[in-house]
Amino acid sequence: MQKRLTLLGSTGSIGDSTLDVVTRHPERFAVHALTAHRNGDKLVAQCLRFAPDVAVVGDAETAARVEAQLRAAGSKTQVAYGKQALVDVSKSDGCDTVVAAIVGAAGLAPSLAAARAGKRILLANKEALVMSGAIFMDAVRDHGAILLPVDSEHNAIFQCMPRDAAEHGGIAKIIVTASGGPFRTREPVTLASVTPDEACKHPNWVMGRKISVDSATMMNKGLEVIEAHWLFGLPSERIDVLIHPQSVIHSLVSYCDGSVLAQLGNPDMRTPIAHALAFPERVDAGVAQLDLAQIATLTFEKPDYARFPCLALAIDALEAGGVASAALNAANEIAVDAFLSRRIRFTAIAQTVDAVLSGLSNRTPSGLDDVIGADADARRAATAFIDKLPAPSVERAA
């Protein structure tokens, strides 16, 4: 039977990779809904190719433009817009599988709606777990949803773990690998002069600009540690980070008998996406087979927390509990946006997050409203902190 997909964030890099896999297996997968924020032209092209029942965009103006283009092309795809429309297509009876690939906090509500509707969720939006881990996992359990990780690291861990609970599997720890990003060997004193274009040039992966900056600061890896905690039920002291510049080993699981299982593959997001789409089966992802003889050398090193303070801040937030992770994520989103807009220096991203967490009145959230409130408070605090920072130099901003 065909799986019917709602693809949240179809115009991003994860969306592109997902649709590439779908194209290879039309007998297995059909598209119910595609969503984008404002990239209407690309969404129209996707709709004309995959003929979804529904297309969702962020605002009325984009919706009107998309609908006009679709009607002119003879498409019957219905067009909706706004936050509620995202929730609606995520819980719709027209789909059984939701690929959650919206970047940032905007992906929380539709991902949670999919969980509460008992959907099969392919989770690429790590913020859903970073912001509301306990709430999200409770919804998955209580409503019979199936949660499959799409992030390459978490998908690798999932493949290396037994199907029963972590506490019964003899697991000693999980090891999340990281490339180290574009600045792994760059002199720390020069990081203040990093430009957005430099930060977005990842050595191994093709990603969107926001996640590329997160990789450059290693905040992305910190968020992945938090996500791993919720996905696999392990405390922070049993989750290690290991720098692996070649991005061939995507993560490892260490067992109490001394065994270590690892998942290897070329750095291509189509592999974990295809695994999650077809699970428990396997399908062709269009990815070349790994040639270890050609690679020849795999190297590893411990992370430098002084070079990457965002990684340390994320682990601190996980250990603090409460709404600290939600505040961390919100402050980081504001800071990264400011950096990409050339309003702050690269090094000010960590400074902003640190300032927000230092001023946080932490508390245990009683529900989603508390999480959303903490997110809003952190965004205001981050914005206020950034407004007080000196503007970057003219040379850098040019």
Swiss-Prot record:
Keywords: Isoprene biosynthesis, Manganese, Metal-binding, NADP, Oxidoreductase. Gene3D superfamilies: 1.10.1740.10, NAD(P)-binding Rossmann-like Domain (3.40.50.720). NADPH binds at residues 11-14, 38-39, 125, 127, 208. The keyword Manganese applies. GO terms for biological process: isopentenyl diphosphate biosynthetic process, methylerythritol 4-phosphate pathway involved in terpenoid biosynthetic process. Belongs to the DXR family. This is 1-deoxy-D-xylulose 5-phosphate reductoisomerase. It comes from Burkholderia thailandensis (strain ATCC 700388 / DSM 13276 / CCUG 48851 / CIP 106301 / E264). The gene is dxr.
